[in-house]
A protein has these predicted regions:
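A residue-level signal for beta-strand positions that form part of recognition/binding surfaces
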Residues: 2, 98, 155
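Short, structured interface segments that constitute the first stable element of a domain
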Residues: 6, 13, 96-122
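Short beta-edge/loop segments at beta->alpha junctions of small alpha/beta modules
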Residues: 1-63
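Short acidic (Asp/Glu) patches
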Residues: 45-46, 83-87, 114-119
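Short coil/loop linkers at secondary-structure junctions
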Residues: 14-15, 72, 181
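Short gly/ser-rich loop at a beta-strand->alpha-helix junction or flexible surface loop bordering the NTP-binding
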Residues: 30-39, 50-111
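Short, mixed-charge, low-aromatic patches
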Residues: 6, 16-24, 86-94, 126-130, ...
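Hydrophobic alpha-helical interaction segments
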Residues: 113-195
Length: 195
């Protein structure tokens, strides 16, 4: 479970110096530091469970979500998340791994991510469509439709069967909100595939 310094100080308020108690808990491995002022109590928990807590608001997206949904063949080791209003890429490294956060437009942020459960622990994960759109948002602009297809299926190594099964209505709804060339190309490609 993710817990903040404030919560720990409150829980340990009966101690004369609760900060020393917290330091001892860290040394014993009862608390694992995630970032300044934030800890995890379960050393065996998978890192993706902490991604939303380390920096919020956020949901897991980009390469990690594409891999999670089996859309790309690579296993992604960095926990990649979407956020907004941070104005630059943020990165945190701790004993659970590396966590990166990238901005997407605020108006598209609330669409198409799901609350998933791992045991009884919730986390937020982008849908397949949203993960792809987020990834295309941060990619360098690709002008021609042929080059765009090559980027999707050879560069990203996107699974073509999964691509064909994506919900085109979701993509049509959010793609224009990104205001990026790659998302317009994605809309064009989907229209071409439908014919």
């Amino acid at each position: 479970m993710v817990i903040s310094s404030e919560e720990l100080l409150f829980e340990n308020r009966s101690y004369a110096v609760p900060q020393i108690r917290i330091q001892r808990m860290v040394k014993k491995g009862e608390l694992i530091p995630l970032k300044r002022g934030m800890y995890e109590t379960d050393s065996t928990a998978p890192g993706f469970l902490m991604a939303n807590a380390i920096l919020g608001p956020s949901y897991i997206s980009f390469e990690y979500a594409l891999s999670y949904h089996s859309m790309i063949p690579e296993r992604v080791m960095t926990y990649t998340s979407a956020t907004f209003g941070k104005n630059k890429k943020k990165e945190f490294t701790n004993s659970f791994g590396t966590f990166t956060y990238r901005d997407i437009p605020q108006e598209v942020f609330p669409y198409y991510y799901n609350r998933e459960l791992y045991g009884n622990r919730p986390y937020l994960m982008a849908s397949r469509e949203k993960a792809l759109c987020d990834q295309l948002y941060i990619a360098a602009p690709i002008r021609g439709i042929h080059d765009f297809e090559e980027f999707l299926f050879d560069g990203l190594r996107l699974d073509e069967d999964i691509f064909d099964s994506l919900d085109s209505e979701k993509i049509k709804r959010i793609a224009p909100l990104y205001h990026k060339t790659n998302l317009y190309q994605l809309e064009k490609l989907i229209e071409k595939e439908k014919r």
